[in-house]
Amino acid sequence: MNHQQQQQQQQKAGEQQLSEPEDMEMEAGDTDDPPRITQNPVINGNVALSDGHSNAEEDMEDDTSWRSEATFQFTVERFSRLSESVLSPPCFVRNLPWKIMVMPRFYPDRPHQKSVGFFLQCNAESDSTSWSCHAQAVLKIINYRDDDKSFSRRISHLFFHKENDWGFSNFMAWSEVTDPEKGFIDDDKVTFEVFVQADAPHGVAWDSKKHTGYVGLKNQGATCYMNSLLQTLFFTNQLRKAVYMMPTEGDDSSKSVPLALQRVFYELQHSDKPVGTKKLTKSFGWETLDSFMQHDVQELCRVLLDNVENKMKGTCVEGTIPKLFRGKMVSYIQCKEVDYRSDRREDYYDIQLSIKGKKNIFESFVDYVAVEQLDGDNKYDAGEHGLQEAEKGVKFLTLPPVLHLQLMRFMYDPQTDQNIKINDRFEFPEQLPLDEFLQKTDPKDPANYILHAVLVHSGDNHGGHYVVYLNPKGDGKWCKFDDDVVSRCTKEEAIEHNYGGHDDDLSVRHCTNAYMLVYIRESKLSEVLQAVTDHDIPQQLVERLQEEKRIEAQKRKERQEAHLYMQVQIVAEDQFCGHQGNDMYDEEKVRYTVFKVLKNSSLAEFVQSLSQTMGFPQDQIRLWPMQARSNGTKRPAMLDNEADGSKTMIELSDNENPWTIFLETVDPELAASGATLPKFDKDHDVMLFLKMYDPKTRSLNYCGHIYTPISCKIRDLLPVMCDRAGFIQDTSLILYEEVKPNLTERIQDYDVSLDKALDELMDGDIIVFQKDDPENDNSELPTAKEYFRDLYHRVDVIFCDKTIPNDPGFVVTLSNRMNYFQVAKTVAQRLNTDPMLLQFFKSQGYRDGPGNPLRHNYEGTLRDLLQFFKPRQPKKLYYQQLKMKITDFENRRSFKCIWLNSQFREEEITLYPDKHGCVRDLLEECKKAVELGDEASGRLRLLEIVSYKIIGVHQEDELLECLSPATSRTFRIEEIPLDQVNIDKENEMLITVAHFHKEVFGTFGIPFLLRIHQGEHFREVMKRIQSLLDIQEKEFEKFKFAIVMMGRHQYINEDEYEVNLKDFEPQPGNMSHPRPWLGLDHFNKAPKRSRYTYLEKAIKIHN
C-alpha cells in the first residue's frame, strides 16, 4: 500500500506488544512522489546501531556491511513538531542501505485524527531497476520507561525499485505516542527501532565467493530443483572425488554425462562467478526442459546417480555410489495362525517419508516401519495354507553413510483429482539418532546422523522457487544457495524456518518448507566430507577443461569483435563444372574458400593476402564480385584492382556480408611457366561464359569463359565454341542467351555485334550453344530453351509413408506441371507398385504431418499442391499403399475399432466399409480381416463401449453415418457365442458385465455380455463368468458381485440370490436411462493406464 493513502484505522499503543500485520495498514511507499527529506535543524535524528549477529556467526564476515541482519535506531527530536517525512542515516545490511522513514499521517475525512507512519526503506537512491531483496523486519517504537511495553509490528516484503519501502501508514495513533503517560515520548523525543533480516540480494554486485567461499549455479529457467540437487551432490565430497576420477578422455564433450558433471563440479570448485548448467542438461539428451516440470527431485537424483553408477563400472571408482547411498531393508509378512513367513530383502537409495498428520521426522519413521494387519477381506494368500491373517511390515537392516530423505509434500488429492502441496509443519532435528529403527544395532557405530542439506520449495504445486541450505563442512555453519546467489545464514534460517506450517508472528500459511533432507552418518562425516584439493583432479581432466575455457574465451572474443570483420567467399572456376542449372553454380552446393577480413582493410591488402593464401602471384589472379542483377540472377562483375586498391572492403562490397567473389586464375599448368592473365579493357571488352547443351543426355557442359571486344560479331565466337566443346570446326551451332530462369532467348543473327545480339550486354552474360542436328528432334528436350523451361518447373518432392511415424521418405524429382496421374505413375515406379494402389495426402501447413487426402480425379497440377510451401522449404507429400484400387477405396470410410478374438484378447483394427453402408457391411468387412473361432457361431456384432462399460449393441441395418467416433467411446466387434445366438426373451436376457474396484465409477478391464436365465442360482452364473475369464479358484474367491443401477451398487448374496430378470431392466418411467449391469468387484492387477490414455513418460537421461 502507498504510504500517502489515508487510513481507516488507528492502532492503540497499549493493546498489544507485537501486533499482527493488517493488509490495509501494511504499505509500500509512493515511488512516484518520494518523501521530501526535511533539512530543518530543529528536527534531527540520532542513530544507534547494534549488531544483530549471534555469537555463532561472529566469524561470518569482518565487513559488517555484508551481514544478514542488524538492529538500528533512529531518534526523532521535537517529535510534536514533525510535519513532513524524515529519514534516518543508512544502516548497511547485505551491502544495501536501509533507512527508517517516519512521517505524520492525516485523514481528510477525520481531520482531528492523526497517526504515525513508520516504514523501512531499502536502496531508494539506486538508479538500477533490476535489484531485489527479500527481508523480514520488526518495526518498534521504544518505550523508555519499560522496554517490555514497547510497541512493535512485523513485516515481510520483497523490496525492489518500485516498492522500495514497506511498513504502516497508521503504525500508532499520534495521540498515543505523544501522551507522556504512555512512556513513548521523553523530552519531545521518540526513538524508532528496526530489526531487519535480509536475504542476499539479486541483481546487484553480490560476490558469493568473497562472502561465503562458494559460488552458485545460473538459473536456466524451468530447471526447478536441479540446481539444489547439484549443489547437494557437489558438497558430498567423497562423491565429487569419485566423479573426478571417472575416465572421460575419449568421451564426446556434448553427450557425456560424467564429463558434464565433472565440468560443473570443477567450475563450482574453481570459479569466482556463478556456473552454467546448459552443457549438463544438453548431455542428458533433453531437447526441452519439460522433464523438470513433470517430475520431482527424487526421480532426477535417482536417474542421475544410476547413470553415473553404470558408467563407473569397470573403473577405479566402481561401487562408490552404492557405498555412499545404498541401504538395505527387509519386507516381511508373518502369518499369525500358521508357521509361514515371507521375507524379501531390498536395496534402497532414499526413503520416502509421509508427513501428513506427522509432527516430526521420528513419527514418520515410526509410521514407515509400522506393522500392517492383513485380515478380513485383506487376508494374505499363504499358498498351501490358503488365506491367512498376517502382519506385514519393513525393517531396516542397514542405513547408508549418506541418507536421502524425501518428504512427501506433494500428494494426489482424490477429492480434487489433482496433486496438492502439504504445507503442514514438520520438524526435523540437526542430529538424528536412528538406532531404534534398525533390526540390529552396532554399539561401536551408532546410527547417529548430522543434518547436511535442506532442500526447500516456496510456492504451491503449480510452481514456485527452489533453494537449498547446506552445512558444507558439517560444523553447523550454514549457507543458503539460491541459484546464482550464495549467502551465509543462521542455523535457525536453515532448519526451523523450513518446518512449514503457521508463522506465529504473521498468522499466514507458510508455503516455504523442506521437501528433501540429506543426513550424513556421524561416524562417516570426516570420510564423506573429506577435503577435495586440486591434487584429487586428474591432470588430463584439468587440461581438457582449461582448453575448453580457452576455446570458449576465443569464441567469445570473436563474437565481441564480429562487427569489425566481414566474410569474403571465394568461388573458383572449378565449381562451375558439372552445374546443371541457371547461372554459374548452385549456392546451396558450392564449396567456398572463406576469408575473415577486417571491414576497414583495403582491397590491395586483401589481394595481397589472397595471393599468398591461394599460391598465385597477383598478376595471375583477377577478382570478379558476384553481383545480383535486377532480374534475379547473380553474375560476375568487373573489379578494378588498380583504381579501387585503396578503397575499403566494406565500401566495395556495399555492406554485403558475406561478399562472394569469383576468383579468376591462370591455368595451373601454365602458371608455373610464369604466364599471366590477359589484359582486360573494362571499357571495350566483355567477359562471357559458355555452356554447351547436349540433347541426347539432356545435360549442360561448362566450356569456360572468354574475353572479347564488345564490337566482336557472334560469328567470330563460333570457332572458340567448337574448340571448347570438342566439335570439328565449322560445325553448325544453335545459340541461346541465358537471360534468367525460364527466359532463354535464341540468337538469330550471327553477323551482328555482341551489344546488338545480346540483351543489355554485361560482364558475366552466358551463351548456351548446341549442335544443329536433326536427330535432336527425337530427344525429349531437343533444345536448350526447352531444357531450361523444364528446369524451371523441376521440383524435388519428398514422399513419406503416412503409416510410418517419422518416416524420412524418399526424394523424387518431378515437374510442377504434372497432373495427379503423372505424379502417381512416377511414385509407383519408385515403389514398384500399381499407381491405382496409392493414395496421396497434402502436407499440413501448420505442422509437419499428413493433411487431407487427394482424390484420384484431382484436376490441379503439382504446382497447385505445393503452392503454400516457402521457396527454400522442403516440399513434402504423403502417401499410403492400398490393398484395393483408389477408385474403390474413395467410396469407403476408415473405421477404427477393437476386435475381441476367441482368446478374449483385444486388438485395434482399421476397416474400410462402404461410406454409405450400414453396420452389416462393416461386419462383413471385418470377417475378411480377422480369423473366426472354429467352434463359434460365425456371426458378428458391434458394441459401443464407454468407460469400460458396454452401453449398447448396434443393429445391423443401422447406417454407419450415424456412428461418429469420439475420444470418449470405443466400438468393438466380436463373434457372438453360440449360447447367445438365440435368446428366449421371456425367460432369458443378455446383461452387461463390467469390472470395478470398490467405486463403481472406477471401471476397468474388458466388459462383456452374459446370458442369464430367470430363476437360476447365481452360483451357476458365477461358474460361467469364471470359465469365460479363465480365473483360478483362489483368485476368483476374492471377487464380489453387485447389481449396479444409476451409479449405486447392491452386493449380491452369492449363496441365496436367484436371478430375477427384472433386476436388470430399467426402472419404469426411466427407459431412457442405462440398464442395470452386473459388476465384478476385485483388485485391478493390470497396468493402471490403458491404451486410451496418453502415457506419461518417465524421466530419462538418454546418454
From Swiss-Prot:
Low complexity: compositionally biased ranges: 1-11
Region Interaction with TSPYL5, annotated ranges: 1-209
Cellular component, GO annotation: cytoplasm; cytosol; nucleus; PML body; protein-containing complex; XY body
Changes after translation: Polyneddylated. Not sumoylated.
All residue ranges annotated as the MATH domain in the record: 69-196
Keywords attached to this entry: Acetylation, Biological rhythms, Chromosome, Cytoplasm, Developmental protein, DNA damage, DNA repair, Hydrolase, Isopeptide bond, Nucleus, Phosphoprotein, Protease, Thiol protease, Ubl conjugation, Ubl conjugation pathway
Ranges for region Necessary for nuclear localization: 71-206
The keyword Transmembrane helix appears for this protein: no
Effect on the protein of changing C224S: Loss of p53/TP53-deubiquitinating activity
Coiled coil: none
Annotated localization: Nucleus; Cytoplasm; Nucleus, PML body; Chromosome
Domains as described in the record: The C-terminus plays a role in its oligomerization.
Subunit structure: Monomer. Homodimer. Part of a complex with DAXX, MDM2, RASSF1 and USP7. Part of a complex with DAXX, MDM2 and USP7. Interacts with MDM2; the interaction is independent of p53/TP53. Interacts with DAXX; the interaction is direct and independent of MDM2 and p53/TP53. Component of a complex composed of KMT2E, OGT and USP7; the complex stabilizes KMT2E, preventing KMT2E ubiquitination and proteasomal-mediated degradation. Interacts (via MATH domain) with KMT2E. Interacts with OGT.
Name of the molecule in the record: Ubiquitin carboxyl-terminal hydrolase 7
Organism annotation: Rattus norvegicus
Gene this protein is translated from: Usp7
